[in-house]
């Protein structure tokens, strides 16, 4: 579909309650809102329309944030704050009619400048007049830095007078408008209340979704905002006041000077530790110079202790903030006003001036050495044919050459180094991952808390509600037998086992963990453990999988009645557990292990690298206890250990394992997020707010797995970063591209083939049944569009991640049908 056709579709799809505004095209998208460019039919001015769907605001806190934003914007009017023109509501959506800022946000000037100056006439003129200080970083000219600092200061001073704290100051929330529209000289510019230089793009603060009224004596405890720009007291979950905004101003000021944030990390805990360890010493890249008085201002704002941090009075009176810029207004660009008006009147948003990605037919002629393979590794998906993606013997060899607008600000856009291209994209992905914590973790935990705090619940038999099920790391037997070895420390060499027996043990363990199955185990006096699901549920799930394969059962409908929400969540929990277990198997190979370990992957009939822990020892399986869960102390409280690359595994193999594990955990996160999204919809449409014991336990389990998967994904990013930045790191254009779909596809077929062999050789029907079901669930995961990565990552990068093409889907459907027939035949033998 062409861009023009798409715009027409959008215009038809979005209908505002009144006829005062028309919608033209989408220009931005966030977690909860889509922003469109529109037109005011009353005066012909361009506007921005922020559309927020009520269905996305299931969490009460999210709805409150929107109401706060509307209330604040209605009360405040300031030339350096994006104004709210109107607000309209329908039964399904909120529409905020706002000022239109045609130049996007400050990140376009910092990260996309080198691309925009080639195409955008106004931006080209600005940077010709105020060139950047260096080609080695993305910092801005000092005049631009001070100009935008003063405009930001003006807006904050106004907010301060209203006892408002923004709480989410960052470059993405600092929008830029075209100058010289309502004025054409410095005098009128300043009479209208603007500060700074009259013929430069104008900065305005936007997005008050996290803002709140906070008097001088008040403290808040809410975790909000974007971690890269968060004050350390917020990162550490401490009470904070309006000074938190000053820290954020310091990070923005530093980024305007150096082209990157002052501190970077892959989770908020590590970020806090880095800030604390710096001990108020702010370092500047060797290729960047900041004048002393500007640097002293940055240091004053980026002071760890909020009590010692520069206050608002000192900030507003700082010599840089109050510097006279009128000498820069003497110069006059004769065509600047016409260029500015042309941009404002055009139908193009700033992002449309960026170089577009090459078409697929063009990319087919690009040699592999010119493509950024790490893009595919990070997302796990690439636009390839079905044969390329799923063929077991022929790796993919063509890919689209993506637009590289997302490089790390420290690096040159014109670098020819493949290593730096890959590293830069990876850095940006790590930065974007912060949004996951903000967007999904808060929602998942909030919903689980709502369930847990719903009061005593009884099941159908009247049993009192128990605590949410969690796997334990120790048991009562530990006291008598000494400390029980952790999963990392215990290893079992099963090379002597046949594939069938090994598969039986591994799948038997999985069945104990999830369904409560326990075959051929020793008698034990240990009390039975409550399992997440039970054998009867397993039978229902497998029967439903067969019926779906035979097209006799439709997927769960959207009618969220109490009678069918639990089965739907059970089905998703089973699929999430399958993906989580696959990721765990890969993850266990990455952690340091005894050199003598020789392990074996029973589900694929292949020997694994040292460090494998494909199955647990027989003690867990025989006693029927949930196995000890792997601890992530080194990943959460000792982050530094994650940067030590395991020397037992060669770097290329370790990198491959880390990438595979990361992709599998991300896929597990998408399934867990989808299950919570389904549950959230039912919960907030359920007026009684009552749930069964079973559903409550499911929700708590999903919450635990979500948090665990997120922690391990962050650990793996640190590991990959350590590998990529190691002095011995070697990049090769021949490095294989890893697709999460192919990992799942190959694994599903391996399990199915081994199960078929076991069925013929050993007759262990129960284990075979579980194996076939596991294979079916894995293949179903590939076909379910709700499990795509953008379920977790609601940002511009999700658009690069595509679903399988039709040939892929047809191939998978054939295997599903075949495996379902085997499972059906097996069940007839078991009757």
From Swiss-Prot:
Pfam families attached to this UniProt entry: ATG1-like_MIT1, ATG1-like_MIT2, Pkinase
UniProt topology in membrane: Peripheral membrane protein
Active site: 168 (proton acceptor)
Compositional bias ranges of the Polar residues kind: 360-382, 405-419
Residue positions binding ATP: 27-35, 50
Catalytic reactions on record: L-seryl-[protein] + ATP = O-phospho-L-seryl-[protein] + ADP + H(+); L-threonyl-[protein] + ATP = O-phospho-L-threonyl-[protein] + ADP + H(+)
EC number assigned by the record: 2.7.11.1
InterPro entries: Atg1-like, ATG1-like_MIT2, Atg1-like_tMIT, Kinase-like_dom_sf, Prot_kinase_dom, Protein_kinase_ATP_BS, Ser/Thr_kinase_AS
GO biological process, alphabetically ordered: autophagosome assembly; autophagy of mitochondrion; piecemeal microautophagy of the nucleus; protein transport; regulation of autophagy; response to starvation; reticulophagy
Residue ranges of every copy of the Protein kinase domain listed in the record: 21-321
Gene Ontology molecular function: ATP binding; protein serine kinase activity; protein serine/threonine kinase activity
Domain of life: Eukaryota
Intracellular or extracellular location(s): Cytoplasm; Preautophagosomal structure membrane
Ranges where the record places region Disordered: 360-419
Top enzyme category: transferase
The family this protein is said to belong to: Belongs to the protein kinase superfamily. Ser/Thr protein kinase family. APG1/unc-51/ULK1 subfamily.
Cited function: Serine/threonine protein kinase involved in the cytoplasm to vacuole transport (Cvt) and found to be essential in autophagy, where it is required for the formation of autophagosomes. Involved in the clearance of protein aggregates which cannot be efficiently cleared by the proteasome. Required for selective autophagic degradation of the nucleus (nucleophagy) as well as for mitophagy which contributes to regulate mitochondrial quantity and quality by eliminating the mitochondria to a basal level to fulfill cellular energy requirements and preventing excess ROS production.
Quaternary structure and partners: Homodimer. Forms a ternary complex with ATG13 and ATG17.
The name this protein goes by in its record: Serine/threonine-protein kinase ATG1
The species this protein was found in: Kluyveromyces lactis (strain ATCC 8585 / CBS 2359 / DSM 70799 / NBRC 1267 / NRRL Y-1140 / WM37)
């Amino acid at each position: 579909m062409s861009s023009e056709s798409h715009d027409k579709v959008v215009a038809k799809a979005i209908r505002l309650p009144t006829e005062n505004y028309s919608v033209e095209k989408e220009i931005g998208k966030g977690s909860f809102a889509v922003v469109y460019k529109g037109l005011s039919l009353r005066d012909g001015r361009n506007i921005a329309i922020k559309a927020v769907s009520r269905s996305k605001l299931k969490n009460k806190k999210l709805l409150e944030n929107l109401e706060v934003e509307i209330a604040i914007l209605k009360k405040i009017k300031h030339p350096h704050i994006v104004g709210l023109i109107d607000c309209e509501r329908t039964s399904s959506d909120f529409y905020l009619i706002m000022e239109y800022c045609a130049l996007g946000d400050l990140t376009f000037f910092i990260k996309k400048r080198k691309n925009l100056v080639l195409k955008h006439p106004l931006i080209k003129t600005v940077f010709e007049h105020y060139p950047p200080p260096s080609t080695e970083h993305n910092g801005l000219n000092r005049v631009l830095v001070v100009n935008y600092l003063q405009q930001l200061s003006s807006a904050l001073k106004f907010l301060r007078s209203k006892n408002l704290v923004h709480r989410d100051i960052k470059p993405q929330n600092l929008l830029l408008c075209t100058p010289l529209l309502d004025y054409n000289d410095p005098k009128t510019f300043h009479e209208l209340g603007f500060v700074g230089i009259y013929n430069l793009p104008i900065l305005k603060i936007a997005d008050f979704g996290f803002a709140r009224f906070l008097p001088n004596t008040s403290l808040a405890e809410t975790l909000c905002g974007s971690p890269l720009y968060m004050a350390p007291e917020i990162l550490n979950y401490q009470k904070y006041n309006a000074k938190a905004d000053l820290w954020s101003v310091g990070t923005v000021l530093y980024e305007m000077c150096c082209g990157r944030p002052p501190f970077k990390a892959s989770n908020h805990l590590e970020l806090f530790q880095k800030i604390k360890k710096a001990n108020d010493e702010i370092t500047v890249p060797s290729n960047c110079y900041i004048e002393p008085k500007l640097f002293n201002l940055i240091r004053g704002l980026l002071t760890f202790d909020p009590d010692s941090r520069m206050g608002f009075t000192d900030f507003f009176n700082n010599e840089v903030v109050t510097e006279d810029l009128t000498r820069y207004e003497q110069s006059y660009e004769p065509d600047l006003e016409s260029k500015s008006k042309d941009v404002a009147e055009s139908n193009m948003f700033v992002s449309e001036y960026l170089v577009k990605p090459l078409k697929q037919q063009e990319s087919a002629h690009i040699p592999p050495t010119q493509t950024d393979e790490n893009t595919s590794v990070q997302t796990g998906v690439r636009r390839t044919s079905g044969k390329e993606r799923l063929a077991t013997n022929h790796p993919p060899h063509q890919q689209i050459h993506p637009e590289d607008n997302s490089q790390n600000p420290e690096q040159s856009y014109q670098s020819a180094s493949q290593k730096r291209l890959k590293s830069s994209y990876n850095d940006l992905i790590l930065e974007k991952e912060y949004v996951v914590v903000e967007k999904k973790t808060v929602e998942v935990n909030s919903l689980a808390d709502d369930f847990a705090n719903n009061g005593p619940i009884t099941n159908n038999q009247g049993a009192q509600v128990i605590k949410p099920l969690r796997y334990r790391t120790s048991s009562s037997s530990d006291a008598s037998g000494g400390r029980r070895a952790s999963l990392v420390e215990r290893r079992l060499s099963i090379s002597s086992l046949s594939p069938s027996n090994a598969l039986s043990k591994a799948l038997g363990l999985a069945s104990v963990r999830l369904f409560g199955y326990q075959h051929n185990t020793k008698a034990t006096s240990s009390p039975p453990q409550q399992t997440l699901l039970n054998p009867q549920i397993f039978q229902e799930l497998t029967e439903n999988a067969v019926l779906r394969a035979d097209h006799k059962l439709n997927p769960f409908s959207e009618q969220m009645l109490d009678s069918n929400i639990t089965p739907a969540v059970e089905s998703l929990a089973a699929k999430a557990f399958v993906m989580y277990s696959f990721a765990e198997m890969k993850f266990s190979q990455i952690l340091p292990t005894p050199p003598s370990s020789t392990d074996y992957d029973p589900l694929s009939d292949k020997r694994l690298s040292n460090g494998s822990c494909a199955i647990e020892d027989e003690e867990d399986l025989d006693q029927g206890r949930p196995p000890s869960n792997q601890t992530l102390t080194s990943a959460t409280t000792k982050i530094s250990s994650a940067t030590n690359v395991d020397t037992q595994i060669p770097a290329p193999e370790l990198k491959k394992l880390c990438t595979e594990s990361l992709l599998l955990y991300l896929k597990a996160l998408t399934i867990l997020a989808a299950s919570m999204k389904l549950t959230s919809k039912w919960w907030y449409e359920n007026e009684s707010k009552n749930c069964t014991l079973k559903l409550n336990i499911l929700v708590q389990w999903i919450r635990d797995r979500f948090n665990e998967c997120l922690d391990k994904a962050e650990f793996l990013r640190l590991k990959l970063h350590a590998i990529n930045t190691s002095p011995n790191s070697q990049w090769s254009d021949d490095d294989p591209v890893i697709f999460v779909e192919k990992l799942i596809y190959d694994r599903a077929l391996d399990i199915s083939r081994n199960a078929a062999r076991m069925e013929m050789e050993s007759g262990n029907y129960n284990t075979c049944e579980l194996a076939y079901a596991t294979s079916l669930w894995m293949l179903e995961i590939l076909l379910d569009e709700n499990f795509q990565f953008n379920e977790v990552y609601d940002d511009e990068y999700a658009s690069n991640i595509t679903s399988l093409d039709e040939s892929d889907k047809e191939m998978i459907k054939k295997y599903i049908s075949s495996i379902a027939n085997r499972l059906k035949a097996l069940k007839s033998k078991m009757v």
